[in-house]
């Protein structure tokens, strides 16, 4: 369900901060988008992805983070489920740029509406993961736009940023890379 408040009362925002409910809220050109808590399945898959990919990311010199703000300005930021960025993009408030963002889909979320924002920041890839069936979509930056990548002959997708090949099988999402693999 969507609701629109023309003006969000400061006391509502303060209460969300006090209760810790604002951690996933986003600001889109000065407009607050209050994101509901993720499901348990969503959280577990996000954690599994972070655990599986963090050692690889670190070896490649990339900083992995979970639910970290990606900022274009103080009143314009998104909170992807996972972010992989270079150390120089890490800031006190979150990240000021990224090489790869991962969005785990939830019913009615705004994942695809974020494509232009991420492209404007120069995000090289966006991986969209569907927790229910563990399928993935990959978008790659081409001429300032994040465009969908077609699956390879095996039906999988390969992230150039991390060098990870993603395929979906009956037993889950398979990730493989030079020297390792994981099934989630």
What are these regions (language model features)?
Residues 41:
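A solvent-exposed, acidic/Ser-Thr-rich amphipathic alpha-helical stretch
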Residues 27-36:
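Short, aliphatic-rich beta-strand segments
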Residues 1-9, 14-18, 22, 33, ...:
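C-terminal interaction segment
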């Amino acid at each position: 369900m969507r609701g629109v408040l023309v003006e969000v009362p400061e006391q509502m925002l303060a209460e969300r901060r006090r209760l810790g409910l604002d951690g996933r809220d986003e600001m889109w050109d000065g407009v607050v988008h209050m994101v509901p808590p993720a499901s348990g399945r969503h959280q577990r898959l996000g954690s599994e992805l972070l655990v599986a990919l963090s050692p690889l990311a670190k070896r490649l010199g990339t900083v992995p983070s979970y639910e970290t703000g990606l900022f274009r300005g103080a009143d314009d930021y998104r909170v992807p489920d996972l972010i992989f960025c270079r150390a120089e993009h890490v800031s006190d408030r979150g990240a000021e740029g990224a090489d790869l963002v991962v969005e785990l889909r939830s019913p009615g979320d705004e994942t695809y509406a974020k494509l232009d924002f991420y492209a404007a920041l120069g995000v090289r890839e966006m991986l969209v993961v569907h927790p229910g069936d563990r399928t993935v979509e990959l978008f790659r930056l081409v001429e300032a736009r994040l465009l969908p990548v077609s699956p390879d002959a095996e039906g999988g997708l390969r992230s150039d940023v991390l060098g990870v090949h993603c395929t979906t099988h009956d037993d889950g999402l398979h990730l493989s890379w030079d020297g390792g693999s994981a099934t989630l």
